[in-house]
Amino acid sequence: MAGNTGERPFVDIITSVRYWVIHALTIPALFLAGWLFVSTGLAYDIFGTPRPNEYFTAERQELPIVSDRFNALEQLEKLTR
């Protein structure tokens, strides 16, 4: 038999005006913040990932794949030059 936890039912929450007043501002603000985070390039700087135009340089057009695990450091040095 299911008991009562004393919490407010979910249907009551999402049909309340207070919920939508709060979330009508916060949900679009989160999307806007995420878009700005990526479009300004800050995400690339913080996480250290290369930007789309930095994956391949003019000198190196092949995929930078490490194929030999025992000589991985040598391969990485050669790939990052």
UniProtKB/Swiss-Prot annotation:
Its cofactor is heme b. It is a single-pass membrane protein. Keywords: Electron transport, Heme, Iron, Membrane, Metal-binding, Photosynthesis, Photosystem II, Thylakoid, Transmembrane, Transmembrane helix, Transport. It comes from the Bacteria. GO terms for biological process: photosynthetic electron transport chain. Its main location: membrane. GO terms for molecular function: electron transfer activity; heme binding; iron ion binding. The keyword Transmembrane helix applies. Gene3D superfamilies: Photosystem II cytochrome b559, alpha subunit (1.20.5.860). Coiled coil: none annotated. Belongs to the PsbE/PsbF family. This b-type cytochrome is tightly associated with the reaction center of photosystem II (PSII). PSII is a light-driven water:plastoquinone oxidoreductase that uses light energy to abstract electrons from H(2)O, generating O(2) and a proton gradient subsequently used for ATP formation. It consists of a core antenna complex that captures photons, and an electron transfer chain that converts photonic excitation into a charge separation. Heterodimer of an alpha subunit and a beta subunit. PSII is composed of 1 copy each of membrane proteins PsbA, PsbB, PsbC, PsbD, PsbE, PsbF, PsbH, PsbI, PsbJ, PsbK, PsbL, PsbM, PsbT, PsbX, PsbY, PsbZ, Psb30/Ycf12, peripheral proteins PsbO, CyanoQ (PsbQ), PsbU, PsbV and a large number of cofactors. It forms dimeric complexes. This is Cytochrome b559 subunit alpha.
